[in-house]
Amino acid sequence: MAYYPSCSGATDQLTIPTIILIGELDDWTPAKDCERLMERRAGKGAPVKLVIYPGAHHAFNVAAFRDGMRSFGHWVKYDADAAQRSVLEVHDFLATELAKIEDRLKTNVASWQQT
């Protein structure tokens, strides 16, 4: 999982399932870069889910930035709604991906037991 990553230099050949969580108004690691990454990698590599939180800035899940502030020239600000929704998104993403792994393991174990 990647909270507000820098997608500008990211490879389009991701090898593991990934969820990207980013704020629409992030001026440090812009969501537009992640949207371009998704366009570049369409159909390549492991599945990637991009979630953009409307009105949210960089560090939207860091409660210490409740009032917002400038950090290294960028605006960081907590957004309780985006933070809560991101936890649910990560939970659902991990549950889905781990269920896929569990299914593959069950299939492998069953085939091993038949040999």
Q: Residue ranges of each PLM-predicted region?
A:
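Primarily recognizes the serine-hydrolase "nucleophile elbow" in alpha/beta-hydrolase
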Residues: 1-16
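Alpha/beta-hydrolase-fold catalytic nucleophile elbow
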Residues: 1-4, 21, 53-54
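Secondary-structure boundary/capping motif
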Residues: 10, 29-30
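Short beta-strand/loop motif that positions the catalytic acidic residue
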Residues: 14, 20-22, 26
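Short alpha-helix in the alpha/beta-hydrolase fold that links the catalytic acid
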Residues: 16, 30-41, 65
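Acidic catalytic loop of the alpha/beta-hydrolase fold
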Residues: 25-29, 58-59
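Short helix-capping segments at alpha-helix termini
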Residues: 42-46
